[in-house]
Amino acid sequence: MADSDAQETRPPAKDSPFSIKNLLNIEDKPTKPKNGLGSSKGVFESGFFSRLGDLSLPRFELPAQRIGLPAQYLERASAWWYPYALGTHFRTAGAEKVNQRETSPILDRHTPDPPKSDQESKEESADDEIALEESDAEEPKKETDQEDDWMRKGEDLESDKKPCRKKKTRTVFSRSQVFQLESTFDIKRYLSSSERAGLAASLHLTETQVKIWFQNRRNKWKRQLAAELEAANMSHAAAQRIVRVPILYHDSGAPEATGGPGTNSPGGQPLLSFPHHMYYSNAVPLLRPV
C-alpha cells in the first residue's frame, strides 16, 4: 500500500523533448512554406530550427580544404554548424553576427532559389512575353531615331565644314598694268626672277601676282594656238576633198531602129544611109505641048 501511495503522490514526469508527444506536435502543426526558405534569411526566420533548440546535436567538423569557401568564412560562420544555437532560448552573439552577415553576396550566391509555383511561373512568362513584344516594337523606333540622329550629325558636320573653306581672292589689274604685262608677254613668254622682280616693282605689284598672271596668260595662249591649229587642219581637209560628178554616156552598140531618118547613131553614122549617091539628070518635061 505504501508503494502504491507513493506512486500516486509522485508528480508526473516532465516530458522529454524526445517523447512521441513532442514529435507529433511538430507534425500536427505544419507551417506553410515561405518563399524565403531557400535563402539564409528564410531559414533563420522560420521556426524550424527554433523547435530544435532543445535538441543536443553533435558539432560537424568540416575541413576547409574540401569546401570552396576560404577558412576565414567558415570561422566567421561557425554558428551555422550548431543548429541548437539558433533556438529562441540559446540565441548568442555569434548567431546575431550571422544574421547581420546573412545578406552578404557570398552566402546568397551559394543558397538555392526557392521553388516557384505554376501560377507564378506562368505570370513571369507572360510578363517576359509582353516585355519582348514591347522591345520588338521599340526596336524599329530606335533604329529610325538613330538614323535621324546620324543624318543630323552629318548635316551639322557639313555646315561646319562649309565656312572653313577660304575663298580665293582675285586680283584686279588696271588698264595700264594689263597693257604693260601684255607688251612684256609678247616680247618674252617666260621671265627670270630678276625680270619678274623689276616688272613687279614698276607696276606696284608683288612677284607672286606677276608670276600667276604670266602662268594664266601662257595657258590662254596655248589654248588659242590649239584652236587655230584645229581650224587650219579642218580647212586643209576640206580643200583636199575630191568631188566626183557622175557622167552620162551610152555604150557603143547596134544602131537603134526606132530612130528617125534624120537622126544619127552614137558612132556618128546616119541611121539611114544609101550606098550610092543619087544623081539627077536633066529634067524631062512630062507634058508635051500640043
Swiss-Prot record:
Residues of the DNA-binding region: 166-225
Disulfide-bond pairs as recorded: none
GO cellular component: nucleus
Region Disordered, residue ranges: 1-41, 96-169
InterPro entries: HD, HD_metazoa, HMX_Homeobox_TF, Homeobox_CS, Homeodomain-like_sf
Entry GO MF terms: DNA-binding transcription factor activity, RNA polymerase II-specific; RNA polymerase II cis-regulatory region sequence-specific DNA binding
GO biological process: cell differentiation; nervous system development; regulation of transcription by RNA polymerase II
Start-end of Basic and acidic residues biased regions: 107-124, 138-162
Pfam families reported in the protein's UniProt record: Homeodomain
Acidic residues bias spans: 125-137
Coiled coil regions, renumbered to chain: none
Keywords annotated in UniProt: Developmental protein, Differentiation, DNA-binding, Homeobox, Neurogenesis, Nucleus, Transcription, Transcription regulation
Subcellular compartments: Nucleus
Family statement drawn from the similarity comment of this UniProt entry: Belongs to the HMX homeobox family.
Protein name: Homeobox protein HMX3-B
Taxonomic source organism: Oryzias latipes
Source species taxonomy: Eukaryota, Metazoa, Chordata, Craniata, Vertebrata
